[in-house]
Amino acid sequence: MWKNGAMRGCNKETGEFLGPSRSQQRRTALEVLVLSEKLAALTPAQLAKLPIPERLLPHITETKRITSHIARKRQLAFLAKQMRREDDTTLETIREKLDASGIQAQREVATLHRTEQWRKRLLEEGDSALTELLNQYPQADCGKLRQLLRNTKTEQARNKPPQAFRELYQVLHGLIITQNSDNQH
């Protein structure tokens, strides 16, 4: 019997099939298995941000604990079975939140890459890259950036610890994050 109370079969009056086909059931089961694998890969802090029912959390924790390949595969299948018992809206909500957090992580990585690219360009190209940066980020402090660039080049020439190099990264990262948050609002 299905969740909606109907049995698989054919309606004698209309000839329509009741309930999902076996292929559809398999596809749904595989989707839930993939979701269970994603949940098992998350940290406890990431799991806490998701709307996961309390009765699933021990199963997820147990899956994370198991390291043996076959035992882990079996536990993932059990977790997926427990998840299939949940209603579709709960699973869909978990999927949406998980996708949203994945998109946010991609944005953060892109911001880190953009920051690193700007730092590299500023050190290699000098004033032309600084002018372009100031055009793109008018709120930037030109004097501080020039000073950090000079100090970074001096550090590199003398093989000193990269203190100004790191500070330059932090300043650029702050600029990019400020610009991104201004654009989103």
UniProtKB/Swiss-Prot annotation:
Keyword vocabulary terms for this entry: Cytoplasm, Ribosome biogenesis, RNA-binding, rRNA-binding
Main localization (coarse): cytoplasm
Region (Disordered): 1-22
Subcellular location: Cytoplasm
Function of the protein: Member of a network of 50S ribosomal subunit biogenesis factors which assembles along the 30S-50S interface, preventing incorrect 23S rRNA structures from forming. Promotes peptidyl transferase center (PTC) maturation.
Keyword RNA-binding part of the UniProt annotation: yes
GO biological process: assembly of large subunit precursor of preribosome
A single Gene Ontology CC term: cytosol
This protein's name: Dual-action ribosomal maturation protein DarP
rRNA processing keyword on record: no
GO MF annotations in UniProt: ribosome binding; rRNA binding
Superkingdom classification of source: Bacteria
Listed transmembrane segments: none
Pfam families: DarP (PF04751)
Similarity comment: family membership: Belongs to the DarP family.
Entry-linked NCBIfam families: PRK05255.1-1
